[in-house]
Structures are given as structure tokens and as C-alpha cells.
């Protein structure tokens, strides 16, 4: 996360090339892999914190990080009959600036062990942008906004881009501002792992963990609609 223009993070130099032997087990396993390169990205605990402009940063308490959102997304996808592996490894354990290298190592190991996943999701949260609403209201409750980031250096990035754009379309049928945008960036974000790879920013550090979880339910709904069609 944290890849908004105003709050760029030093992510480009640490991204690893895809190991040559990853195709040792090239059978597609039909599962989704959800993981978190920036595992400790945190959300607010309460709406009162937002009112007080106490924006979240990082925490090891997974009840208030992107891991919690990943748990919600996992549960929601499984209700649609989609099998999921949710990797909650702390990819920041070797240092924040090595997070992409660490996550690539982890997802490569899981791919070698389990076969190629049908879809890889790196789930983040963004950084708050001043004077921009972080939530939308659906059925009377606040839901975190969503965005997608596509690395244009990934060999088959156009497939990832098409998937992200279709996801945006479906989410914005639910609410016209639920998905803010699809951002293309000149790097790969480890999306060279597959031509079915998404980096999803669910909310930012001005939303609560609960609001992010609500968004994850809608992300699952859109993913389920595209299951067997685009991935």
C-alpha cells in the first residue's frame, strides 16, 4: 500500500525477478492465494479516531491490519465455493524496504509446493489523501473505497490490467464510487508471478478495520462473478 502519488514508498528497487525454476510444479491448483507484502499496514480502530484525525500507521495486531481484511475476503470467497490459501506471513520481517523481495520468496515457495494458483492477490491499504473521501455509504453503512494497482513491467500485465478494469466496473455497479481507479505503475509489484495477479488497495489509513472488511465482501462478490470467466 501507500503508493499514492503524495506518499510514494521505496518499493521499486527491492522487487525480485521471478525465479527460473518456479515452473517445476506448473499445474494450476484452482485456488486463490491472498497475501500481504506490507503485512503491518493498519486501519483505525474506531470512527472516533478519524474524527480526531488520528490516522493509522502500522501495527502487529492483525485485528487492525490488512490481514484482518484478508481474513474477511477469504471467508467471503469460500462462501462462493472458491478455495483460498491466505498467507499471513509477516513480509516486513526482513525490513520494510525488503518486503517485496520477501513476499516474492514466500509466494514462490507456495507455488512450488502447491502448484500455480488461479489468482494471486496482494492485499494492501492505501495512504490517506487529504480532502478525498475514504468511504462510500452503501445500505446506510460506511464502506472503504477500493483501488487496483497494475505493474506494467510484468510480462503479461495487459491481462492483469483487463482483470482489474473489469473488477472496477463491477464494483462501481454496486456503488459508482466504490472503486476509485486502476493505477498503472512502471514496475512489476511481483505481478510477474502470473497473468492473473491483482494488487488491491482496500481503504486507507483513515478508515476503520470494519469498513475495510465490508469492502472485502464486495470485492469477493465481484471476484466470484468473474470466476471461470476471466480467471
Where are these regions (language model features)?
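Non-catalytic propeptide/linker segments at domain boundaries
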Residues: 1-37, 42-46
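Soluble periplasmic/extracytoplasmic beta-strand elements of cell-envelope proteins
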Residues: 31-36, 83-85, 119-124, 145-149, ...
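Solvent-exposed loop/turn segments at secondary-structure junctions
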Residues: 39-42, 90-94, 125-130, 153-156, ...
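A short, glycine/acidic-enriched catalytic loop
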Residues: 53-56, 129-155, 164
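Second-shell loop/turn segments in exported
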Residues: 55-66, 89-100, 150-158, 201-210
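Catalytic-core regions of hydrolytic enzymes
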Residues: 58-133
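Active-site-adjacent substrate-binding region
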Residues: 156-183
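Active-site-adjacent mobile loop/cap segments within catalytic or ligand-binding domains
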Residues: 181-231
Amino acid at each position: 500500500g501507500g503508493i499514492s502519488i503524495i506518499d510514494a514508498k521505496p518499493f521499486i528497487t527491492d522487487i525480485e525477478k521471478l525465479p527460473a525454476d518456479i515452473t517445476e510444479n506448473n499445474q494450476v491448483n484452482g485456488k486463490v492465494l491472498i497475501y500481504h507484502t506490507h503485512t503491518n499496514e493498519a486501519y483505525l480502530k474506531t470512527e472516533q479516531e478519524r474524527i480526531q484525525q488520528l490516522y493509522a500507521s502500522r501495527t502487529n495486531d492483525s485485528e487492525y491490519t490488512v490481514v484482518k481484511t484478508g481474513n474477511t475476503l477469504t471467508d467471503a470467497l469460500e462462501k462462493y465455493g472458491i478455495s483460498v490459501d491466505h498467507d499471513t506471513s509477516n513480509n516486513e520481517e526482513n525490513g520494510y524496504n525488503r518486503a517485496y523481495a520477501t513476499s516474492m520468496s514466500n509466494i514462490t515457495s507456495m507455488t512450488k509446493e502447491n502448484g500455480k494458483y488461479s489468482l494471486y492477490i496482494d492485499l494492501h491499504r492505501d495512504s490517506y489523501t487529504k480532502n478525498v473521501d475514504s468511504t462510500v455509504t452503501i445500505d446506510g453503512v460506511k464502506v472503504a473505497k477500493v483501488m487496483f494497482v497494475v505493474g506494467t513491467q510484468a510480462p503479461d500485465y495487459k491481462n492483469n490490467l483487463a482483470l482489474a478494469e473489469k473488477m472496477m466496473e463491477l464494483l462501481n455497479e454496486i456503488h459508482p464510487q466504490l472503486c476509485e481507479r486502476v493505477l498503472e505503475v512502471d514496475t512489476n509489484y511481483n505481478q510477474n508471478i502470473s497473468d492473473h495477479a491483482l494488487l488491491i488497495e482496500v481503504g486507507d489509513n483513515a478508515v476503520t478495520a470494519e469498513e475495510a472488511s465490508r469492502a472485502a465482501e464486495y470485492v469477493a462478490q465481484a471476484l466470484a462473478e468473474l470466476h471461470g470467466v476471466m480467471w
